[in-house]
């Protein structure tokens, strides 16, 4: 016979029970359907983004926080504990690693990203600009191969921002570091562009050449690095998703008319 403590422990480890607790942010679906049960784990606020970061290779708490900058440290800790309780994640020696169950969500997370790129209005996406997330993603996907075989320092300046205006990417021996303060190295390439333009390039909506032609992208410094920028810059893994040929127009709602009786 289960004691109250046993019951409490089981409830804390069961996603359906946890979702139904009064202090939870969700109430649970109360269905045996596998879609409902999986959604109680996957669809908790911030969880898909945390899983995205883990699937992209982030292993440490601070790296996860940089990839999801708007989540509080307290809530991130809670979500990581929940993922461990649900069997998707293990923590060992200060590192977080996905279990086979967590890795099995890769196709789902990537599919969600491709769906968003294909069907969500690009203009809506470009309203959610975040220099921290953009530069962190660029650091993660930059390809050092086209760059000169030496330390290369690239400075990005987003002139319209009041703070977090300047960022540096330092590429050395295949490693890429992101700095928010001047690393003290000579800058090989200097880029000045609005954050929206840089985000558009990263998302595959625009290109370096198109933004230069439009007068929204200034680059100076090493000419070879500038010439091959589109090659080493990398793109969002979702950039290759193609938009539908013709935008799907939503069906207009017909106003409800109450007909008088008589």
Regions found by a protein language model. Give the residues of each.
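C-terminal interaction segments
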Residues: 184-262
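Basic, amphipathic "hinge/linker" alpha-helix immediately C-terminal to the N-terminal HTH DNA-binding motif
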Residues: 43, 92-112
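A short, conserved structural fragment
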Residues: 84-93
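N-terminal leader segment of winged-helix/HTH proteins
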Residues: 1-39
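Basic amphipathic alpha-helical segments that dock to polyanions
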Residues: 76-84
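N-terminal helix-turn-helix DNA-binding core of bacterial DNA-binding proteins
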Residues: 33-71, 86
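Amphipathic alpha-helical dimerization/coiled-coil segments
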Residues: 110-157, 164, 223
């Amino acid at each position: 016979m289960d004691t109250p403590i046993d019951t409490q422990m089981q409830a804390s480890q069961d996603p359906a029970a946890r979702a139904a607790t009064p202090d939870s942010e969700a109430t649970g679906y109360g269905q045996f359907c596998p879609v409902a049960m999986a959604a109680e784990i996957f669809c908790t606020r911030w969880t898909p983004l945390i899983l995205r970061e883990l699937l992209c290779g982030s292993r440490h708490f601070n790296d996860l926080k940089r990839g999801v900058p708007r989540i509080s440290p307290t809530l991130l800790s809670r979500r990581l504990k929940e993922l461990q309780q649900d069997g998707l994640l293990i923590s060992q020696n200060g590192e977080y690693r996905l279990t086979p169950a967590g890795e099995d969500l890769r196709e789902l997370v990537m599919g969600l990203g491709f769906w968003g790129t294909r069907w969500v209005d690009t203009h809506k996406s470009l309203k959610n600009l975040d220099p921290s997330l953009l530069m962190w993603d660029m650091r993660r996907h930059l390809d050092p191969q086209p760059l000169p075989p030496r330390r290369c320092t690239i400075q990005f300046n987003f002139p319209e921002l009041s703070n977090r205006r300047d960022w540096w990417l330092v590429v050395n021996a295949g490693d890429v570091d992101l700095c928010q303060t001047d690393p003290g190295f000579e800058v090989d390439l200097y880029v000045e562009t609005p954050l929206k333009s840089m985000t558009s390039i990263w998302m595959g909506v625009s290109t370096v050449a198109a933004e230069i032609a439009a007068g929204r992208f200034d680059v100076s410094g090493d000419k070879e690095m500038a010439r091959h920028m589109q090659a080493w810059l990398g793109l969002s893994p979702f950039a290759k998703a193609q938009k539908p040929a013709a935008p799907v127009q939503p069906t207009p709602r017909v106003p409800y008319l109450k007909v008088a009786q008589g």
